[in-house]
Amino acid sequence: MTIELSIVIPMYNEEDNLEHLFARLLEVLTPLKITYEIICVNDGSKDKTLKQLIDCYQSNRQIKIVNLSRNFGKEIALSAGIDYAQGNAVIPIDADLQDPPELIHELVDKWREGYDIVYATRRSRQGETWVKQFTAKMFYKVIGRMTEIKIPPNTGDFRLMDRKVVNAIKQLPERTRFMKGLFAWVGYRQTFVLFDREPRFQGQTKWNYWKLWNFALDGIFSFSLLPLKVWTYLGSIISLLSLAYASFLILKTITLGVDVPGYASLMVAILFLGGVQLISLGVIGEYLGRVYEEVKARPLYLVSDLWGLEYLPLEKLN
């Protein structure tokens, strides 16, 4: 039997949310009168998430489980769920219920109108501090200016993707997965629906500011060469300024006979240029590190157990 809709849910320590998550999902999916599956990816949870998932699977075989061998991170867990999803349309959604399952109706309606990607754009972000809202806004502005692809602002992973979009994403092999960028890169006919993001239902977010910072860097370095170009421009400007200053000192000495003092200014210049060089080396190192990860060609993830699914051939995981 053909599955029309796959719901993909990455999970890490979400035992407190599962009961309400499935209750709301089933309440939404049942009236749609389409064949569906719910792909739950357990990303190395340390609580009772896996046990509760198995109990849910025993009572409802439309709930299927991908149990990863360890914690690979949300982006990889999401990729695993997309790999195993069989539906004609796929909807990734968070397990914390900040993305309302009730919006699935609107996503499906837009898909039936002929759109290939229907993303859910946040009109408001309840339960988040002003600092997080401000940094998120700045991130979308920065990455929008630094990359050639248009990543929709205020949009997470919650969206509907047609099967041809999913197949295109599965062909993208990079190990550093910035899924929002990959979703935008493939193109196709896109539209959006607005929603008010709810506070997290229970538990604490797994994303602290350090993780969010690294996530932002992954997005920038994965989709932009501007950080490399900046140092070319900066180096050229510093070289021209240094040449102009050196010419000024030479002329001043020749015409006025003034000695050139200043060990302090010399030390400041050396330290400044040393700092610039170290930062530029760090940027180059970020790109080289990503090249190193790619050439190792390890699988994106390893699956420990499956419930309701069959193992994919290893070549599909590379």
Curated annotation (Swiss-Prot):
Any single Gene Ontology cellular-component annotation: plasma membrane
Gene Ontology MF term list: glycosyltransferase activity
Enzyme class: transferase
Naturally occurring in which organism (per UniProt): Synechocystis sp. (strain ATCC 27184 / PCC 6803 / Kazusa)
InterPro entries with a match to the protein in the record: Glyco_trans_2-like, Glycosyltransferase_2, Nucleotide-diphossugar_trans
Entries under Pfam families matching the protein: Glycos_transf_2
UniProt entry tagged with the keyword Glycosyltransferase: yes
SUPFAM superfamilies assigned: Nucleotide-diphospho-sugar transferases
Membrane topology: Multi-pass membrane protein
Family affiliation: Belongs to the glycosyltransferase 2 family. GtrB subfamily.
Top-level taxon in the UniProt lineage: Bacteria
Record-given protein name: Uncharacterized glycosyltransferase sll0501
Keyword Transmembrane helix applies: yes
Subcellular location: Cell membrane
This protein's UniProt keywords: Cell membrane, Glycosyltransferase, Membrane, Transferase, Transmembrane, Transmembrane helix
EC numbers on record: 2.4.-.-
